[in-house]
UniProtKB/Swiss-Prot annotation:
PANTHER family: CYTIDYLATE KINASE, CYTIDYLATE KINASE/PANTOATE-BETA-ALANINE LIGASE. One of its GO terms (cellular component) is cytosol. Belongs to the cytidylate kinase family. Type 1 subfamily. ATP binds at G12, P13, S14, G15, A16, G17, K18, G19, T20. It is an enzyme of class 2 (transferase). This is Cytidylate kinase. GO terms for biological process: nucleobase-containing small molecule interconversion; pyrimidine nucleotide metabolic process.
Length: 230
């Protein structure tokens, strides 16, 4: 039986810096990228476009099963493509983000997207960005990272990110939404947000992205041996 491509899972709460880290890792290693959170955001956007109620699990399941999503990594950004359309900017609004968190709590919706996510595991390797990548989707992954940061720091990062993209946002409201989302994600019955038992926990509150990248690459070398880099 051929050896499966290695997987590095990067889990953690919203705003911890997972997206930036995963993009840098995918570029550095030349590996494929799976943005699990984006898949849920794409599904949420599809639901909003098709007027599917966010609490209608039975209607969301077939929508999830037939979701056509791709991630195109280049030197500057990761493009999220839904049925041929670049929805990278649209899915990053707070409305879509909150909708994604709600639909992710449905067990049958998560199951419908599970197989699609696992299909991203292809040579030479996969960087899997999410909240339950190391605990549920790829429990056998060779490298597991749990990237964390304080709620205040994550709100500040998100505030700056949205402002830079031209969105009008309120910091206090953003902080409240992050805390509420944390509570939902950490306490949901299915796949709650928590580090895998064999994950390296990295608190990025006082770290630069470069420091986080060096830490993660060093750990990957320990777990995998010599990883080829671009």
């Amino acid at each position: 039986m051929p050896q499966m491509a290695p997987v590095m899972t990067i889990d953690g709460p919203s705003g911890a810096g997972k997206g930036t880290l995963c993009q840098l890792l995918a570029e550095k290693l030349g590996w494929h990228l799976l943005d699990s959170g984006a898949i849920y955001r794409v599904l949420a956007l599809a639901a909003l476009h098709h007027d599917v109620e966010l609490d209608a699990e039975a209607a969301l399941v077939p929508l999830a099963a037939n979701l056509d999503v791709q991630f195109q990594v280049d030197a500057e950004q990761v493009k999220v493509v839904l049925e041929g359309e670049d929805v990278s900017r649209t899915i990053r609004t707070e409305e879509v983000g909150n909708a994604a968190s709600k639909i992710a709590a449905f067990p049958r919706v998560r199951e419908a997207l599970l197989r699609r996510q696992r299909a991203f595991r292809q040579a030479p390797g996969l960087i899997a960005d999410g909240r339950d990548m190391g605990t549920v989707v790829f429990p056998e992954a060779e490298v597991k990272i749990f990237l964390d940061a304080s709620a205040e720091e994550r709100a500040a990062r998100r505030y700056k990110q949205l402002q830079d993209k031209g969105f009008d946002v309120n910091f206090e409201r953003l902080l409240t939404e992050i805390r509420e989302r944390d509570d939902r994600d950490r306490n949901r019955a299915v796949a709650p947000l928590k580090p895998a038992e064999d994950a390296l926990v990295v608190d990025s509150t006082a770290m630069s992205i470069d420091e986080v990248l060096v830490t993660v690459l060093a750990y990957a070398e320990q777990q995998l041996g010599d990883v080829s880099t671009n």
